[in-house]
Amino acid sequence: MSASLDLRCYLVTGAPHEKVVDVAAAAAAGGAGVVQVRSKPISVRDLTALAVEVAAAVQKANPATRVLIDDRVDVAAALMPEHNIHGVHIGQDDLDPRLARQLLGKDAIIGLTTGTLPLVQQANEYADVIDYIGAGPFRPTPTKDSGREPLGLEGYPALVEASRVPVVAIGDVHAEDAADLAATGVAGLAIVRGIMQAENPKAYAESVVSQFSEANER
């Protein structure tokens, strides 16, 4: 389990694939606390190679930023000993979180996808082995069809109250949502397109962090 994890600005990588390494580094330089390497569809070998590149670039840009692998516990386990990889984010159909913890060790960061109250309650059974949950979608999103109804701002307070671990909002989240989402009690914003398509990903990440922090100080 990670003692210090900054979830305020959490980049989930996506298209365009050729920009992933540069955008990840820029977001890290702007204060993104987490970068999740996700690039679907992608082969395991290509994901591994991409993760190594992202990890090196992020470490150079901001050593405090944590780098996670999407879904593939095996890739995370293979890379963690020698690269700047810190854990994994797993979905409902991926490896059981307890097994992931056994494989990755006590210091790894493990996140789990949720998005409904029953899923949050189920995730609480893993509160001793996961570090946070992702909850969404906030809005309908073209990057991932979860089959779940959008939560909107009104959907998060109940999930935050029910969860035994920090909650990260995801699903067409943008910088301008930071203050409103912070008010719901979430620990941070997971952003895909907003950062990936930003003209200045560093400035975008800085904006998310500052707006989220200012809202929590009110």
Curated annotation (Swiss-Prot):
Gene3D superfamilies: Aldolase class I. InterPro entries: Aldolase_TIM (IPR013785), ThiamineP_synth_sf (IPR036206), ThiamineP_synth_TenI (IPR022998), TMP_synthase (IPR034291). SUPFAM superfamilies: Thiamin phosphate synthase. Keywords: Magnesium, Metal-binding, Thiamine biosynthesis, Transferase. Coiled coil: none annotated. Its cofactor is Mg(2+). GO terms for cellular component: cytoplasm. Binds 1 Mg(2+) ion per subunit. 4-amino-2-methyl-5-(diphosphooxymethyl)pyrimidine binds at Q36, V37, R38, S39, K40, D70, T113, K144. It catalyses: 2-[(2R,5Z)-2-carboxy-4-methylthiazol-5(2H)-ylidene]ethyl phosphate + 4-amino-2-methyl-5-(diphosphooxymethyl)pyrimidine + 2 H(+) = thiamine phosphate + CO2 + diphosphate; 2-(2-carboxy-4-methylthiazol-5-yl)ethyl phosphate + 4-amino-2-methyl-5-(diphosphooxymethyl)pyrimidine + 2 H(+) = thiamine phosphate + CO2 + diphosphate; 4-methyl-5-(2-phosphooxyethyl)-thiazole + 4-amino-2-methyl-5-(diphosphooxymethyl)pyrimidine + H(+) = thiamine phosphate + diphosphate. Mg(2+) binds at D71, D94. Its EC number is 2.5.1.3. Disulfide bonds: none annotated. 2-[(2R,5Z)-2-carboxy-4-methylthiazol-5(2H)-ylidene]ethyl phosphate binds at T141, P142, T143. It is an enzyme of class 2 (transferase). Pathway: Cofactor biosynthesis; thiamine diphosphate biosynthesis; thiamine phosphate from 4-amino-2-methyl-5-diphosphomethylpyrimidine and 4-methyl-5-(2-phosphoethyl)-thiazole: step 1/1. One of its GO terms (biological process) is thiamine biosynthetic process. One of its GO terms (molecular function) is magnesium ion binding. Condenses 4-methyl-5-(beta-hydroxyethyl)thiazole monophosphate (THZ-P) and 2-methyl-4-amino-5-hydroxymethyl pyrimidine pyrophosphate (HMP-PP) to form thiamine monophosphate (TMP). Belongs to the thiamine-phosphate synthase family. NCBIfam families: PRK00043.3-4, thiE. This is Thiamine-phosphate synthase. It comes from Corynebacterium jeikeium (strain K411). The gene is thiE.
